[in-house]
A protein has these predicted regions:
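A structural signal for small-residue-enriched, beta-sheet-centric alpha/beta enzyme cores
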Residues: 1-74, 78-88, 95-401
């Protein structure tokens, strides 16, 4: 497996486009379409927020069919908390895309992101979808990625190539997300395309596992959104022997490439946390169970006191062990070890009295890793997050959600 350059059009048989439909006040790209020239196995996971948006309800039904061919997306309006009209608008968005592409409506996923509680500007949206369909091309992957952004500061995309059954297989993905990031799936839109041949039921299970290893290990601010969706389309044009079960000899290579692509995108979202100045990796080891390791890591990653300490470049390790302690994870206080940037600060639950000046260069870095051993077992987990800055408050004070 190797990392490569490419957009969602890198795998065989995929076209995409993003256009400016006038939904965003900024005038930026705001409508996108991704299209597979042949039916593709699909797998998706969606927000766990009980106030899920209309497009999530529609797309959940698409996912049940096992096969799909297109994804239609708009940014600038979430179509959430919009009642029956919102649901009707999402279905119209789906039907319009399907008609233009000459496929069945149930083969089209729909996604929206942006301001909650407002109706979609349907005239602009439908015109935008038509323009995007007219613009579909292998060379329009970047414009597609631009069109799904809201408060993002950079385009998020990743691509990998691997060999499966003697065939070259490509995985490529795009994502958006910068705020309201918290499992399970939160203010993230993620679309991954691949030309691997895999059975729909196998793909569905793999997507869920991949999300648990990547996007569900990212925290920016602890808020869970209404619209999050991770959708994977696999059209089989690589012509490898179809992967029919997890026991297939090629399953592991397929799954590793899917996770690699998803993990890259997840880390980019943490890097792009609203107002972030630091990318933080929280490693928990020595846990009694994986669930405990994740629980402790999440508590640390979500803690405003931990996040603001890193923004201030203050090695306040007490906040880290405190968060682990109240997380509910099993731990042995007199066996806890903690390091930041490889420098041991706590040994067997006691202060190592490291001079602040020794830690200053580490705390000044953009990417910082911390590791805490709970002393309770052998399990581990890693969560990615960012700091909290003045800019985060400014952005969310000014951005109308």
């Amino acid at each position: 497996m190797k990392k490569t350059e490419g957009w969602v059009t890198a795998p065989q048989g995929f076209l995409a486009a993003g256009v400016k439909a006038g939904i965003k006040a900024s005038g930026n790209h705001d409508v996108a379409v991704i299209f597979s020239t042949v039916p593709a196995a699909c797998g998706a996971v969606f927000t766990q927020n009980k106030m899920c948006a209309a497009p999530v309800l529609v797309s959940r039904e698409v996912n049940k069919h096992g096969y799909a061919q297109a994804i239609a997306v708009n940014s600038g309006c979430a179509n959430a908390c919009t009642g029956e009209q919102g649901l009707a608008d999402a279905k119209k968005m789906q039907a319009h895309t399907a008609e233009l592409l000459g496929i069945a409506p149930e083969a089209v996923f729909v996604c929206s992101t942006g301001v909650i509680g407002q109706f979609l500007p349907m005239d602009k949206l439908l015109t935008g979808i038509a323009d995007a369909v007219d613009s579909l091309d292998e060379c329009e992957g970047e414009s597609c990625a631009m069109a799904i952004q809201t408060t993002d500061t950079f385009i998020k995309h990743a691509a990998y190539e691997t060999e499966i059954g003697g065939k070259k297989v490509t995985f490529a993905g795009i994502a958006k997300g910068a705020g309201m990031i918290h499992p399970n799936m939160a203010t993230m839109l993620t679309f991954i395309t691949t030309d691997v041949a895999v059975a729909p039921d196998v793909l569905k299970r793999a997507v869920k596992k991949a999300a648990d290893k990547s996007f569900n290990m990212v925290v920016v601010d602890g808020d869970t959104s209404t619209n999050d969706s991770m959708i994977v389309l696999a059209n089989g044009l690589a012509e490898n022997e179809i992967i029919l079960s997890e026991e297939h000899p090629d399953y592991q290579a397929f799954f590793e490439a899917l996770v690699a692509c998803a993990t890259d995108l997840a880390k980019m979202i943490a890097h792009d946390g609203e107002g972030a100045t630091k990318f933080l990796e929280v490693n928990v080891t020595g846990a009694a169970t994986w669930e405990d390791a994740k629980t402790a890591a999440m508590a640390i990653a979500k803690s405003p006191l931990v996040k603001t300490a890193f923004f201030g470049e203050d090695p306040n390790w007490g906040r880290i062990v405190c968060a682990a302690g109240y997380s509910g994870a099993a731990m042995e206080a007199d066996k806890v070890n903690l390091s930041i940037g490889g420098i041991r600060l706590v040994e067997n639950g006691m202060n190592c009295n490291v001079p602040a000046e020794k830690l200053a260069p580490t705390m000044a870095e953009h990417d910082i890793s911390m590791s805490i051993d709970l002393g309770a077992g052998e399990e581990s987990a890693t969560v990615w997050t960012c700091d909290f800055s003045y800019e985060y408050v400014k952005i969310n004070g000014e951005y109308h959600t």
